[in-house]
Amino acid sequence: MISVVISYSSNERRFFDSIIEECSKFSDNIIVSCLGRFFDGEIDKGLIEVISKEKSKNVGFVVDDTNEYQTFKDKHNGVRWNAIQECKYDHILFLDGDEIPDGDLMKKYLERKDYEKYHAVSFQCYWYFREPFYRAKSLEECGVIVKKHLLTKDFVFHESERWNFTNVTNNYLRNQNFNGEVIMHHYSWVRTKEEMMRKVKAWGHTNDKDWNTLIEEEFSRDFNGKDFVHGYNYEILKEIVV
């Protein structure tokens, strides 16, 4: 059994039920870790509704209202650090709130116990844009399992954030799947226009591009088969996977 840490804000509310349902198929120690404010300083008022509605014996919540973490990277790292203390197993899967595993496939992968041989393991993922049935033909990477004993504060608070978990040791595996089947699904940009605007206002890549203009142009028309983030090509799914 592994613990699961989910970095969450109410910007990811539409994914929350699915990620909890899927993670519950392979873990009984799920920690949802949040900051009381978005990265732009606005109070995350949506947390109260989620916590009061969703808290159960298998899901714990850690909410930090201290405003201790000032930089974007420290905020990301701090959310994970706060949750580690609540994890009861020797291995922890770190997810963002829009990274949803196929719970049945993950359970089968974990039952092999190959991950126990390594300090860290990451996963291939499908990547989606605008709607959950627009899936990029290019694979990406998300989700990292790490041995808990490695997770000192110096280790967690690193410039590379959670990807430091695979960068600082030679004993890791990247881009894992189960018998060729992709386990992880990243719905980062599956959002309405308003949700995308909220996302780019309060995340660590705010200054990378003129996101507002790109979003306005994107929603001035139907989806044209390419995203403005990576420029991937897409397939249209007949049914939503998770």
Model-predicted segments: where are they?
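Active-site acidic Asp-centered loop
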Residues: 35, 95-96, 122
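Cell-envelope/extracellular polymer assembly enzymes that use nucleotide-activated donors
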Residues: 1-5, 29
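Short, conserved active-site loop motifs that form the nucleotide-linked donor/cofactor pocket
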Residues: 2, 57-60, 118
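Short, well-formed alpha-helical segments that are part of the catalytic scaffolds
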Residues: 11-26, 30-34, 39-45
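Residue-level detector of structured alpha->beta connecting loops
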Residues: 27-28, 88, 117
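Catalytic-site signature of metal-activated, phosphate-bearing donor transferases
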Residues: 69-84, 99-242
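Short beta-strand-to-loop acidic/aromatic patch adjacent to the donor-nucleotide binding site
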Residues: 89-102
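Active-site-proximal specificity loops/subdomain of glycosyltransferases
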Residues: 35-91
